[in-house]
Amino acid sequence: RQMKRLFFIAVAAFAAVLTLSSCKASREADPDFWLGADISWVTEMEASGHKFYGRSGEEMECTALMKDLGLNAVRLRVWVDPSAHGDWCNKEDLLVKCLRAKNLGMAIMVDFHYSDWWADPAKQNIPSSWSGHSYEQMKEDLAAHTIEVLQYLKDNGVDPKWIQVGNETRNGFLWSVKSNEFGWPELDENGNTTIIESMGHAERNPEQYAGLFAAGYDACKSVFPESIVMVHLDNGFDQELYDWNLGVLQAGGARWDMIGMSLYPYWAMDGGFRDDAETTITDCIANIRHVSEKFGCDVMIVETGFLVDESDPEVLEEGRRQLARVIRESINETGGRCKGVFYWEPECKPSQYKLGAFTEDGCPTVIMDAFSDWSE
């Protein structure tokens, strides 16, 4: 975030330009680089009887274990009305996890999905209680939900450092696809989803996408004026995606304070976007430099993950090495513009999610060592 100490006049001129940028100038730089994890699943896992263990085999609460492993921040998602899915990740469940992090002195990122369940590039289903609303009504819905959740946290002593307006919004957010009874998208004969409501779809309704995002940004600032409000896209290696999507927001008058990226080399290769993990990481680091310069703001890798196979030490060691590289180059190769790296759901069982970083019985694998030995 800080420029080099030389060329003070150039820095001042550049700062003046930034005030005109879509990326709102951030407050005084925090000197820390943040190492974090999204552990939103933890309370649901605990309720099923799952336990977590430290390096020495002692049972530990998951948030405390993350801190013990060298992390200083957590990321936690929130859904609008997940009552059909056990009420996990509602505002009350969010508060439980936030208080654990707060009491450990860890920074908190809140990830608004603006859906009753999962929101990602394949689906951004409009909450059931908002369905059929007009654009103006939906801006009010979004703002009211955002303020309700954040005020609830504030009233309980929680002050999130970062707030995401949407989750992986490459195609915008608040647009619905035809889904089955379990909430998963139904695919047609060609393997495609069918969009049934396109309110905030970035390609179909770009102005509405920007307007909805702006409503979320303003709502965040109304409760926590000093919070860092983020736009979050997937495929951090894809410069063209970021130029297009952020350009849509910029053209629509939306603002943000920081750009969040997802980086999953495994999925990049699985989807045929890149041939190998090393190129994926290289392209992501280059994109961090690119978007931070083009849009004048800092960046975070808010999701990453690597293949875990506790029966194959070589796979685990490769994951540790790749994560260490991501952290190291985010610190050393981005001109100070990348401010953190967060692992997505490392505590998950491999049988539940194969890009976690723990064993089936709740012990951290060597992948987690990267958070403490990334410089080696």
Annotate each predicted stretch with a short phrase.
Residues 64-205, 209-228, 234:
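Substrate-binding cleft and catalytic face of glycoside hydrolase catalytic domains
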Residues 19-22:
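C-terminal motif of bacterial Sec signal peptides marking the signal peptidase cleavage site
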Residues 35-39, 74-76, 108-112, 161-165, ...:
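Hydrophobic faces of well-ordered beta-strands that scaffold small-molecule active sites
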Residues 47-51, 118, 180-191, 195, ...:
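Aromatic-rich peripheral "rim/lid" segments of glycoside hydrolase catalytic domains that contact
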